[in-house]
């Protein structure tokens, strides 16, 4: 086994419930049992757990509730405390302390909050405490949700400068076709780079309790890989899966991280879900891609979404291709006013300015 490593383990609802309506306690105990010797050996373990809504529904004896966001948040509020209590009880069997962190998209979008979350996470790890992380579903609305714990786990892996991200699911890995409907589907063992062909292979989740299918796992793998983090998608029910993966055994589908990973700030730029889109003309597109230029207001054709200055947004071409992520120096309303204008006109149009560029090249990363 390698020297001390940082491992993020994401456990989906389908793994935690075994496909049923309640938490599969025996199976979760087994997963904790696999983590204990790794922790004792000096590895830094982080758990990203789903299951708050399922736990809340079980605790309230499966109430009949309207299918609304408020109902889900009610269940999450009740279930989150039950879920963290459960994790604490199990890890305490091995004299391991845990610390709870609840995150939202806003914690990832804002650079200062991102750094604060990173410092908290590292402090827990430095003191031998296992962080147990979930999205704060009790307060998060669509506008501030990461959206699924697959992508959340990739962002957590970036926060922690993790070596590996293990996505445990109800499937053995990524298949060439949907194994539930195609008996000829083959398990893909190694992936060097994610492309459109792989994305087409990704199927949806069959669990009504979860939010992430194989497509979101590919998105998470792509984000983590760009940061140099190795990702494995594997079956959570496979005996010894965590230890086998750490020992380098062939488990599930392994996505290799970039050999030249992004620097720390660039990782952050690619991590948060973009708060909005900026469509640019062909001239701006060429300047960004071929000359590494900053984005000027003159090259902006359209702005979508509502966002503040200092937030990560996405730059897109006129044919809808994702070109880059970057930090906008102007909010969305201001951008709509200065779009298509020269930089020297910004002050006259807005009555103020934060400089001649909308997104500086140092605050930008190509997709």
From Swiss-Prot:
GO terms for molecular function: ATP binding; glutamate 5-kinase activity; RNA binding. Substrate binds at residues 50, 137, 149. Residues 275-353 form the PUA domain. The keyword RNA-binding does not apply. It comes from the Bacteria. It is found in: Cytoplasm. Its main location: cytoplasm. It is an enzyme of class 2 (transferase). GO terms for cellular component: cytosol. SMART domains: PUA. Pathway: Amino-acid biosynthesis; L-proline biosynthesis; L-glutamate 5-semialdehyde from L-glutamate: step 1/2. InterPro entries: AceGlu_kinase-like_sf, Asp/Glu/Uridylate_kinase, G5K_ProB, Glu/AcGlu_kinase, Glu_5kinase, Glu_5kinase/COase_Synthase, Glutamate_5-kinase_CS, PUA. PROSITE patterns: GLUTAMATE_5_KINASE, PUA. Belongs to the glutamate 5-kinase family. Catalyzes the transfer of a phosphate group to glutamate to form L-glutamate 5-phosphate. NCBIfam families: proB. HAMAP family: ProB. This is Glutamate 5-kinase. It comes from Sodalis glossinidius (strain morsitans). The lineage of its organism: Bacteria, Pseudomonadati, Pseudomonadota, Gammaproteobacteria, Enterobacterales.
């Amino acid at each position: 086994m390698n020297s001390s490593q940082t491992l993020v383990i994401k456990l989906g609802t389908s793994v935690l419930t075994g496909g049923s309506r309640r938490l599969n306690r025996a199976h979760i105990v087994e997963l904790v049992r696999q983590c204990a010797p790794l922790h004792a050996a000096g590895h830094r373990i982080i758990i990203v757990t789903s299951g708050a809504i399922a736990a809340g529904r079980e605790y309230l004896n499966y109430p009949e509730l309207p299918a609304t966001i408020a109902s889900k948040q009610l269940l999450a509020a009740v279930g989150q405390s039950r879920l963290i209590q459960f994790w604490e009880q199990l890890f305490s069997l091995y004299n391991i302390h845990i610390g709870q962190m609840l995150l939202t998209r806003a914690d990832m979008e804002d650079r200062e909050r991102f750094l604060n979350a990173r410092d908290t996470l590292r402090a827990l790890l430095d003191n031998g405490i296992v962080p147990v992380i979930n999205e704060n579903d009790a307060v998060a609305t669509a506008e501030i949700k990461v959206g699924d714990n697959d992508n959340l786990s990739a962002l957590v892996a970036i926060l922690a400068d993790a070596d590996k991200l293990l996505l445990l699911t109800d499937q053995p890995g990524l298949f060439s076709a949907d194994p539930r409907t195609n008996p000829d589907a083959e398990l893909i063992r190694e992936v060097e780079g994610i492309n459109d062909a792989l994305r087409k292979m990704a199927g949806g989740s069959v669990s009504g309790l979860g939010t992430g299918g194989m497509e979101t796992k590919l998105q998470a793998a792509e984000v983590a890989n760009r940061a140099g983090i190795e990702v494995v998608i594997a079956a959570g029910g496979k005996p010894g899966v965590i230890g086998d993966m750490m020992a380098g055994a062939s488990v599930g589908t392994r996505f290799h991280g970039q050999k030249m990973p992004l620097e720390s700030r660039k990782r952050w730029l690619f991590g948060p879900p973009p708060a909005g889109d900026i469509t640019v003309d062909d001239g701006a597109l060429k300047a960004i891609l071929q000359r590494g230029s900053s984005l000027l207001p003159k090259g902006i054709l359209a702005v979508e979404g509502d966002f503040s200055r200092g937030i990560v947004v996405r730059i897109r071409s006129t044919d809808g291709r994702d070109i880059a992520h970057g930090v906008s120096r102007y909010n969305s309303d201001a951008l709509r006013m200065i779009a298509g204008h020269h930089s020297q006109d910004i002050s006259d149009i807005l009555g103020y300015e934060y400089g001649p560029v909308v997104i500086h090249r140092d605050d930008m990363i190509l997709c």
